[in-house]
């Protein structure tokens, strides 16, 4: 981010605050930066907005792949190991060692009372980022008192493609967050 801010300044666009956002894997990265890296950010992060970004990796949430079943624990460890870059074994699930191993790739595990405000959208028929994982993130933000809005697209898969009204509300809320958390200078 330092390089982005420096290059923008060089081109005549001073950056003195930012919002960060993304979708799918980009949403995962946006959440990680927002919850994990804001203390080191060269400029303040006003809020994060994302859609369908994976935020946690618990086998019981990934039942759409059958990874919640005891006989699939080795497959779950393999998939989550690839996704997080961690060396995982089935016996780690449900332990503090598992959380520690996947923390660098799991935005959920970085949520604190100091997390930035969040606008997020998830889909109940998503086969890429299981909806159950988003419920954990919504709950963590609520439990920590973090201002957030969670939009649920009840007819869509990974792309919010069947819930245009929900998607419109999501985008309108992003605009409201801009006004609230990053108002233009007078």
Description of each model-found segment:
Residues 1-186:
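Alpha/beta-hydrolase superfamily serine-hydrolase fold, recognizing
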């Amino acid at each position: 981010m330092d390089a982005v801010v420096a290059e923008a300044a060089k081109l005549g666009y001073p950056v003195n605050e930012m919002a960060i956002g993304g979708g799918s894997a980009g949403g995962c990265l946006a959440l990680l930066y927002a919850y994990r890296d804001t203390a080191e950010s060269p400029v303040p992060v006003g809020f994060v907005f994302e859609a369908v970004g994976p935020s946690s990796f618990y086998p019981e949430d990934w039942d759409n792949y059958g990874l919640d079943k005891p006989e699939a624990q080795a497959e779950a460890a393999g998939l989550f190991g690839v996704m997080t870059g961690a060396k995982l074994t089935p016996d780690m699930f449900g332990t503090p060692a598992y959380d520690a191993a996947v923390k660098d790739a799991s935005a959920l595990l970085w949520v604190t009372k100091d997390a930035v405000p969040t606008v997020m959208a998830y889909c109940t028929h998503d086969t890429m980022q299981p909806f159950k994982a988003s419920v954990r993130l919504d709950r963590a933000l609520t439990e920590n008192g973090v201002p957030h809005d969670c939009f649920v697209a009840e007819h869509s898969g990974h792309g919010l493609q069947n819930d245009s009204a929900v998607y419109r509300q999501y985008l309108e809320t992003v605009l409201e967050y801009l006004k609230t958390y990053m108002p233009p200078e007078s």
